[in-house]
Amino acid sequence: MLRVHALWRYPVKSLRGEACETVTLEERGVVGDRLYAIRDTDGKFGSGKSTRRFRRIDRLFELSSEYEDDVPVVRFPDGGTMRGDDPNILKALSGFLGQTVTLAREEAIPHFDASPVHIITTSALAWLQDRLPDRQI
């Protein structure tokens, strides 16, 4: 028997996300997942790696995001939060990341790297934990 242990959604690409009790799936994947991304002045989206479309921005992983009334809310490491529709969000993100950025809503091309949905089994997590004993998986 299969059991779902956790459901996660990531409102802003490459930021930590939010645990959800339920999600709605549609053609593009989980509703609201990676619907927003941080974009640099060259038009590349912030990510953990650099590719043709994405640029590595190291401090992204220190931030998390969740939704409040369909608006992404960014949480900073100090616990402070800022809504995506706050006029000061771009200044705060740019200051934190050390470069000028914008918060971009998805347009014609999705913000997904490869796939809109990922299913990770607990056995795969256990396998990874065995190989990385000094890390919390």
Please provide the spans of the model-predicted regions.
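Electropositive, beta-rich accessory/interaction domains or terminal extensions
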Residues: M1-I137
